[in-house]
Amino acid sequence: MYGKIEKIHFVGIGGIGMSGIAEVLLNLGYKVSGSDLRKTEITERLEGLGGEIFIGHARENVANVDVVVISSAVHDDNPEVVEAMERLIPVIPRAEMLAELMRMKYGIAIAGTHGKTTTTSMVATILAKGGIDPTIVIGGRLNSIGTNARLGQGQFLVAEADESDGSFLKLSPTIAVVTNIDADHLDFYKDIDEIKDTFVQFINKVPFYGLAVLCLDNGNIADIIPLVKKRFNTYGLSTQADFRATDVRHTGFTTSFVAHYKGTLLGEITFSMPGAHNVLNALATIAVAMELNIPFAEIQAGFKAFGGVGRRFQVKGEVRDIMVVDDYGHHPTEIRATLAAAKGGWDRRLVVAFQPHRYSRTKELFEEFVKAFYDADILILTDIYPAGEKPIEGITAESLAARIKRHGQKDVTYIADRNAVCDHLLGIVKPGDIVITLGAGNIWQVGETLVEKLKGDL
């Protein structure tokens, strides 16, 4: 960045996307400050790295900064944003700052409605194993390094590209991956056609020497391929895909498959993450790694070393033969994939506690949510996590639970108070069960409490 920018302030610095950029900037030597509503493990980490953290938003927090960075969750009436605008301090979206970091490197941007965090984490791991030493900014904690960001010395920056508000169009990646396109964020987009058009724009921002990596198994991506003007490779289980998986096997946490490229056998890939959707994420990663000339043997070794991502089928504990898992899945497609992974990897009763995320998403995808839980043997719903949204009349977790029950789901319970979910689980779980907490809000706390209480009963 131009030398006159020295102090950068993040409004909502504790968010997983904001904190990653802040950490990279701290490691680059910039003075970084930020505010959030509460102290967390993330804010404490940034403070330990030299960041100045304010708890609560106040006008005086931005008195001596050069630029203010905001996420899509921060509104114009935020006192720090108001103060910055009055002082004529630039206020920029998170994606613009990420684009600035990407401008200094060759960017690898992973986009898609689902699978971004896992795929970004896989790519970061394999590139590091291949000696490329990338800078990484991920929307989840990479278990192998204990954080979601890292400043590397190599030429590449690997980052998640957030499509939720169209701001990923500010990025200009050298390699763009699109894992899938699905109906989501319909509070911002008019319809699926507008979402597809935005992804076409994103893909075509790749330079003439770059590459797009596209999942052919996704129908919406297949629809837009004729509109892609840049060099691309496809991947999937389809026989028409450039990178293809065969002989897929799932046993517990272990997934393995045989990889092929344009009819040529590459070899077997094995990694510790369940689910057919993660086979696709792995194929995307192979496509990126081979574009960067990483030998396939090193790709194989990287996958064997891959330790997964926080809140993506993350085991919180196993007590009395009851496995407690947490997963970020909050869209019907993600929920189906996660539950299918659990059923495919284990022959165990599946107890699911789901916290819907955002009123707008629950409204727009209500009927899809109704049919997303058929793999759950027992389903518990708790109140919607608002994520800053105001309630929408008639859109509640209770009404969703009732509708799910009417559609044939046999064991569905609505519990308004999230804190009461744990006590309910304690009364119904038994040895052999898998308990999954699902949602992008704070439902993960239920799983952690459950593990502690199960330990206390020993």
UniProtKB/Swiss-Prot annotation:
Pathway recorded for this protein: Cell wall biogenesis; peptidoglycan biosynthesis
Species of origin: Geotalea uraniireducens (strain Rf4) (Geobacter uraniireducens)
PANTHER family: UDP-N-ACETYLMURAMATE--L-ALANINE LIGASE, UDP-N-ACETYLMURAMATE--L-ALANINE LIGASE-RELATED
Keyword RNA-binding: no
Enzyme Commission numbers on file: 6.3.2.8
BP GO annotations: cell division; cell wall organization; peptidoglycan biosynthetic process; regulation of cell shape
Function: Cell wall formation.
Similarity comment: family membership: Belongs to the MurCDEF family.
Amino-acid positions noted as binding ATP in the UniProt annotation, renumbered to this chain: G112, T113, H114, G115, K116, T117, T118
Keyword NADP: no
Primary localisation category: cytoplasm
The entry's keywords: ATP-binding, Cell cycle, Cell division, Cell shape, Cell wall biogenesis/degradation, Cytoplasm, Ligase, Nucleotide-binding, Peptidoglycan synthesis
Pfam families reported in the protein's UniProt record: Mur_ligase (PF01225), Mur_ligase_C (PF02875), Mur_ligase_M (PF08245)
Subcellular location: Cytoplasm
A single Gene Ontology CC term: cytoplasm
Catalytic activities: UDP-N-acetyl-alpha-D-muramate + L-alanine + ATP = UDP-N-acetyl-alpha-D-muramoyl-L-alanine + ADP + phosphate + H(+)
Name of the featured protein: UDP-N-acetylmuramate--L-alanine ligase
